[in-house]
């Protein structure tokens, strides 16, 4: 991962002055101390210019780290480092599969993966950016993990030979902030080059944590493709080779750890239907996006004790069923109250059902979204009851969200 230039010496990060300054600034900001006052206090501590900016950035980033890390009050990330860091639950699930193996982490960033490694699992992490490497070491200490951090280029042949004894080669390659990252060649280090260089010796396997945009047809080697969702969002595509491979395709839904594993031939998805067919609802299910992206819809519903029909597939995948059911494969469940064909009918349905607000869940431009939403909500009673409006095959579905 490439970091912006802060102009600070990486070795300073290992000194107690740095950690103490970050902790103090975090406490001051937690107490709503104005930033001007914070900088004045740092100046009195002898921290000015780039050092002060760096300390403030790391301290402020802790507040945003809350959504990714349980020890967010203690971690050391820059804004860019946190942006690319693997969420703690996602990293822990991956490292659980690598438990007991020695591992070399190529391109460790600021330590989002190696914080899960234990003393019994020999681990070396390589990072080309010295500043990132120093922060990674700090985060390893925060989590009481065990990993050696090495500054170097993972594709350097002399460095690669050092890792010949390691059983697993792991890499979460860097992709620039403007990159679409739809091919392996865009990534740094390129997984294909990693496999060529590190494949000279026999290993348990390679593991790559890839951007979710990459399609399976872009991966030209035999591997298990693990589609990971976190908090209802498609988050990662993990790739496992060798003895680490369990199947051809899998889905991991976090938190919770629900898994689907499958090999060809894959099950057919539920039969399609439309809003006015006899197979329709009234229950509507929004499928977890990792399930949809993996094309394992048939496997996801095969063991459920209800019959489902496919209502929509594309930007979101919607199923319908005559009875309610709860399952980790469903991101949300709705109960459809009305099926109408025009927006004036939607507005009338909202009024009759006692709703005060409406959320639109169909393709519409941002400008049109608010115009249509305001027109639907105009004149509705005050309150908190919110309806969700879908549009499928030209039909508007007025629904209310239920607990899954």
Whereabouts are the PLM-identified features?
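SAM-dependent transferase fold signal centered on methyltransferase-like domains
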Residues: 1-404
